Each structure stands twice: as C-alpha cells, then as structure tokens.
Design a protein with these regions (language model features):
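Active-site rim/loop-helix segments in enzyme catalytic domains that contact anionic ligands
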Residues: 1-129, 157, 248, 254, ...
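Histidine-centered catalytic micro-motifs
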Residues: 23-27, 145-146, 220
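Active-site environment of divalent metal-dependent phosphoester hydrolases
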Residues: 30-31, 57-60, 139-144, 174-176, ...
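A structural signal for short, well-ordered beta-strand segments and their strand-loop junctions
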Residues: 50-52, 89-90, 133-136, 144, ...
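Active-site adenylate/phosphate-handling loop in enzymes that bind or generate adenylated species
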Residues: 119-163
C-alpha cells in the first residue's frame, strides 16, 4: 500500500481555545515521534499539554554528566519551548530501562507503578484541561520498550475514563524501510524480538510536516544533546525519515484530523 500525502502548506483553520494532552515516556520521544504535530497544533492556536512519564535516567549520555535526570529534564524543557508546548507535566516515575536490566526492579520505575492509578491521574488532568484528545503510543509502544508499552496502557485507560478520542503514535515500518537513518534503528536493536511500528494499512492518520515544522522538529531533537548526535540531524535523509508522523486513531475523528494535510487512511 502506498501513502501519498500533500506536503504543501496546510489549509485548516484556527484551533484557539482547544486542548490536547500528549503523553510520552522519556525526554526526546516528544520530538522524535510527534514534534511536527505538536508544533502545528501550537501554531494553529491549540493548547498542547505535554506529559512525560520519566526523566529518562537510563538513557546513555554521549558525554559525561553528573546528574543525567537533571540534564534530560532541562533538555526536555528546551525542546518543549521549540515545539510551542503550553504546559509541561512530569509524572515523576523513573526510567525502567530495558528488559533484563536491574533498573526494571527499581521501586520507582515506571514498570513498578500502579498504571491504573497513573491513568486516573492523567484522566483528572485531561478533565481539568478540558482536553479533546489524548495522544499516547500504539499497543507495542512503537518499538517494544517497556516504558512505552506502559505509557500506551496509561493513555488508553485515561481516555477510557474520560471518553476522549485517542491517537496512538506509531511509525510506518514500510515507509521507514526505505527512508533515511532513524533513531529507531538503534532502539529496535536493543529490544529483541520486536517489530517496530505498524504496516501502512493499520495506520489511520498521518501528518506531513511543512518545512518550518520540520525545522522546529529538528531543533527540538537537537535540544536533546545528551542523547542525539547533531551529525544525525544533518543527514541528507533526515526529511525522508522524519517529515511524516503517524497515528492509529481510536474513537471518532478529532483534533488531529483537523490539522490540514493530515490524511485519514481508514
């Protein structure tokens, strides 16, 4: 199946006074998987509330740091500013790391949390913010990271409590097979036995970034200097790998479907 998207300037109207809650597992996920979408929402006047579950303590820094959690929180704040996020909320759980790591047994690890309780907390936030939609991950957490799977469960539970439309962030594995280098190349190698993303036919909604949105996404990714090599962002294949963002929608058409060159596929 071939997906053709109009990459010209979107024509949708303003979204002033409307809100979406975007849930991610670690700092940098917001930029990599939803950066262009968040930037477009903000540019159209929507209020974007970014919720990040952990500080990404188990991410391997590219250089020596004294407090990786503090560094990554600061990077997240800079990235959120680049993307136009109106409010940043940290759930305060600890990065669980990967299967087999001792960190998964840490009492504060996201994997050890009561996910229903976290979902209830998120639902209260959704109601307080009067958000119309919740963005989370697909059922496999895009590439099988345990924290991403947990975030999927938390997001779906909160959406179920509030009756909101859910957009499950994912990637199109058929597209990325032919695209340039992507951070998922290394991520999937660290999680064995998992196929990343979805095939094109499973994706319901896709957004093509405009040049300005892609530039904002690149800047947001660049803010995460402890994790992302700036040279990767200068790769000639950057646009091929990152200009599209994909979702599986659960529920009626909602806010993300009103963003212009977003195409509903099913």
């Amino acid at each position: 199946m071939t997906l053709l998207l109009d990459t010209s300037l979107p024509t949708a109207g303003r979204l002033d006074g409307r809100t979406v809650v975007v849930l991610h597992a670690h700092p940098d996920d917001e930029a990599v998987f939803t950066g262009a979408t968040v930037r477009r929402l903000a540019d159209r006047g929507a209020r974007v509330v970014l919720v990040t579950a952990t500080a990404g303590e188990m991410g391997t820094p590219r250089f020596a740091v004294d407090d990786i959690a503090a560094v990554r929180r600061a990077e997240l704040e800079r990235a959120a500013e680049e993307l136009g996020v109106a409010r940043l909320v940290l759930l305060g759980r600890r990065d669980s790391g990967l299967p087999g790591w001792e960190s998964t047994a840490h009492p504060d690890a996201l994997l050890r949390a009561d996910l229903r309780a976290l979902g209830t907390t998120l639902a209260r936030l959704v109601e307080r913010e009067q958000a119309e939609a919740v963005v989370t991950y697909d059922a496999d957490g895009i590439y099988g990271h345990p924290d991403h799977v947990a975030v999927h469960l938390v997001g779906r539970y909160a959406a179920g409590l509030t009756g909101r439309t859910v957009y499950e962030s994912t990637v199109d594995r058929e597209h990325l097979h032919f695209a340039g280098a992507h951070v998922l190349d290394a991520a999937t190698a660290s999680v064995r036995g998992t196929r990343y993303g979805r095939v094109t036919a499973e994706i319901t909604t896709a957004l093509a970034a405009t040049p300005s949105e892609l530039a904002a996404k690149r800047r947001a990714m660049a803010a995460h200097t402890s994790q992302i090599d700036p040279a990767e962002l200068d790769d000639p294949g950057f646009a091929d790998a990152y200009e599209l963002e994909w979702f599986v929608r659960r529920g009626p058409a909602g806010l993300l479907d009103e963003l212009g060159n977003v195409h509903a596929l099913a």
